[in-house]
Structure formats: structure tokens, C-alpha cells
Amino acid sequence: MPEEILRTVADGICTVTLNRPEKRNALNSAMVESLHATFTWAAQQEDIRVVVVQGAGATFCAGLDLRELATQREAGAVETHGLEEALETLEACPHPTIAAVQGDAIAGGCELALHCDLRVGSDTARFAMPLARLGIAVPIALTWKLVDTIGAAPTKELLFTGEAVGAEAALTLGLLNRVVATADLQRVVTDLACVVARNAPLSVRAMKAFVQRLGEERRRLRRDDLEALFRQVRESADAREGLAAQRERRRPVFRGA
């Protein structure tokens, strides 16, 4: 069985590849655990200057493996995937991070891309957060990330509708830094990573820390009530119905409970 998370390092650039193309790189628990370990390892390597995150095949990442998630919930394991912890590790990485987004970046895949410092997309790139269609809520940390990146009104439209945003619209909103032809994506990302890697690492790391600290200061607020609301939605009957409907390929019937 092939490894589902690949890691290579060359010329100071660490490339992390989601390698489950037959499942559109949907993240199962083992992949999330491996991502967490990989990002932790990369953060500790002084010879790494840049981290690139990409997906094998035509899709960046379709989000969490919903079949696995539904099975876990049926077994009473409400939250075992650890994606938020893995993304926190990615965001805390002192090295600049770049997402190479080809095709869909859906739900957890959108989160993964947004937790990278820079995002380069192919002309096939699409971003979507269709969690309301599953009866679940977006993690609070991602809500902040979206508002910081694209503003409150576009965030509300993205979350309320669950509709996908194409590459050019994503560029306009700020979800992407650049859009290139699919055939050029790998070359452009490599060139960008090399430009960053050639700069003074202490300088780049310091400036990344400056930008992140400013964002953290804006987020300092009481959020106990928001965490409680997130748990309420996550554990609701609607959330169970949404996942069941997805698995059974039918339209969900939400009752607001």
C-alpha cells in the first residue's frame, strides 16, 4: 500500500504531498496524524527554508474522509481526526509555507490551504466550505482565518451557501495569491519557493512572526460561548443526518435540532 503522505526535501524546500488521489486526497485519521508529525518535524529543521503542500492527481484535497467520520460518530467517537491540531502545527511552522492548489480544496482541504502563508492555484482550483449542507459548523479558527483573508461579507456568503468559488474569483477575494495554467503550476510554485528560500532565513522567519502576531492580537476575545455553540452543532441530530445523507447519497432532511 503506498504511503498517503509523502515528504521530500531538496535545496531547502520541503514538499509535502497528499497521496490518496483515488479518494481525491480525502484526509483519513492516519493522514492527519502523519501531517501533524510531518509539520512538527519540518518546523525543527534548520536547513528547511520553505514548506510546500500539494495534492497528488487532479485534486488538492476533498476534505475529511466523510465515510470514516460517519463511522467514528456511529461508534460514539465524536472528534478523533485531530485536523485542527495538525493545522495549528502548520500555521506555527517558522518557515514560510506555500499551498499548490490544483482542482478542489473543499472543507478541510480549504482549511489546509488557508493555513499556508501563500497559495498558488491552477486555473482548475475551486474553494468551498459546504459544511452547512452536512449540518455541521466551521471551526472557529477557520472562521477567523476566512474573515482575515477575504473579509466578513464574502466569508458569510461562502459559509451560508456552501457554493464553490473558482480560481479567478478566489484570486480576487484573496484566497489565492496567483492563478496559473495547470501545466505551469508545479514550475511556478517551485520558482516562488526558490525565490523565498534564497532570502535570509532569519529575516523571513521574523517577518512571518510579525504578521502572525498582529493577527493573533486581533483575535484575543472571549470565545467560551462560541466553543459551546460549535460543540452543540457538531453533536446535533442535524450533523448526524448530514453525514448519513452524504453516505447514502440522498438529500438531507434538517430539523434544526
Regions flagged by a language model, labelled:
Residues 33, 55-89, 105, 133-135, ...:
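Glycine- (often His-adjacent) and acidic-residue-rich active-site loop
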